[in-house]
């Protein structure tokens, strides 16, 4: 109880019907996420033709999503059943840490997937091909940096506290301490605004490169008096463009999933009077659903 901010005490308990609905949602998304990401990892790791450097990033994305749901699904089921957090303050902090860690690793893995598509499509033969060693270094850097940022609240830079709905835990966005808020400013930049900027930059040039390529193909076909000009190289480029669309869809879904949680953090800092326990539910509902999207998108591909 000492970890719960006074702001939440002004609100009555949530409608009891919310908890069964949350439990059903978590059961549905948990099973889908664990099964989907496990199949993704198994297929990519056991199919020789799919064991490419670029697909190592896909496997890492599936692993981060699988780890998120594997560690957060059981506690959520327990708290929804008892209508409150019953697992103690220490596990509350561990729970929040793992959620932030997997979310951070997920977004930066997708940033690297996007950058790889940019390198292949925009730079083409002039770009340095992605090697297994380079992909492994990218993956290692994702986890090391994500761990460093998410460990900070354990050392006094912000803290992990129960959410207002008492079914989960996260960063303390209600604290008015300047040091605590500075963590949220920097962390928001690190896991949201900077990745978004990089992603937009890459896709602007990817779209330009694809448009220029298609125009060149049409002009060449017109000169030769045929309807289309599709040789082996063109087919390869077309496949790369298809993969880029898949990656862009996945990144877009990720930002749709995590934007509500970002808004909750910022509303908590600057307009807390508008923030009720019910609203805090939507942040992690969208965030948890994100872990289901990725295996579906890549399975279709």
Swiss-Prot record:
Its main location: membrane. Glycans are attached at residue 165. Contains one covalently linked retinal chromophore. Keywords: Cell membrane, Cell projection, Chromophore, Disulfide bond, G-protein coupled receptor, Glycoprotein, Membrane, Phosphoprotein, Photoreceptor protein, Receptor, Retinal protein, Sensory transduction, Transducer, Transmembrane, Transmembrane helix, Vision. Residues 44-55, 116-134, 205-245 are cytoplasmic. The chain crosses the membrane at residues 19-43, 56-78, 93-115, 135-155, 183-204, 246-267, 279-300. Disulfide bonds join 92-169. Signal peptide: none annotated. SUPFAM superfamilies: Family A G protein-coupled receptor-like. It comes from the Eukaryota. InterPro entries: GPCR_opsins, GPCR_Rhodpsn, GPCR_Rhodpsn_7TM, Opsin, Opsin_lateye, Retinal_BS. PROSITE patterns: G_PROTEIN_RECEP_F1_1, G_PROTEIN_RECEP_F1_2, OPSIN. One of its GO terms (biological process) is visual perception. The modification N6-(retinylidene)lysine is found at residue 288. Photoreceptor required for image-forming vision at low light intensity. Can use both retinal and 3-dehydroretinal as visual pigment. Light-induced isomerization of 11-cis to all-trans retinal triggers a conformational change that activates signaling via G-proteins. Signaling via GNAQ probably mediates the activation of phospholipase C. Homodimer. Interacts with GNAQ. This is Rhodopsin. It comes from Faxonius virilis (Virile crayfish).
């Amino acid at each position: 109880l000492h970890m719960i901010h006074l702001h939440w005490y002004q609100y009555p308990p949530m409608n009891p019907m919310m908890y069964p609905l949350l439990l059903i949602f978590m059961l549905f998304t948990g099973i889908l996420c664990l099964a989907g990401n496990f199949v993704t990892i198994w297929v990519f790791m056991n199919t020789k033709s799919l064991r490419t450097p670029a697909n190592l990033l896909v496997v890492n994305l599936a692993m981060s999503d699988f780890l998120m749901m594997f560690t957060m699904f059981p506690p959520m089921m327990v708290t929804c059943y008892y209508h409150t957090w019953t697992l103690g303050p220490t596990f509350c902090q561990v729970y929040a840490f793992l959620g932030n860690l997997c979310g951070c690793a997920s977004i930066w893995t997708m940033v690297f997937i996007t950058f790889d598509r940019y390198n292949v499509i925009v730079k083409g033969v002039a770009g340095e091909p992605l090697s297994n060693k380079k992909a492994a270094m990218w993956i290692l850097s994702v986890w090391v940096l994500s761990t460093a940022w998410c460990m900070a609240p354990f050392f006094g830079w912000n803290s992990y506290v129960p959410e207002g709905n008492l079914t989960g835990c996260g960063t303390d966005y209600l604290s008015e301490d300047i040091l605590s808020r500075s963590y949220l400013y920097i962390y928001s930049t690190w896991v949201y605004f900077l990745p978004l900027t990089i992603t937009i930059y890459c896709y602007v040039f990817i779209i330009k490169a694809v448009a220029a390529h298609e125009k060149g193909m049409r002009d060449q076909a017109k000169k030769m008096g045929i309807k289309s000009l599709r040789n082996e190289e063109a087919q390869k480029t077309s496949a790369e463009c298809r993969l880029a669309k898949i990656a862009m869809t996945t990144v877009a879904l990720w930002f749709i999933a995590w934007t509500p949680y970002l808004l909750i953090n910022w509303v908590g800092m600057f307009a807390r009077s508008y923030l009720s326990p019910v609203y805090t539910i939507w942040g992690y509902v969208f965030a948890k659903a994100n872990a289901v999207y990725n295996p579906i998108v890549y399975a279709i591909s």
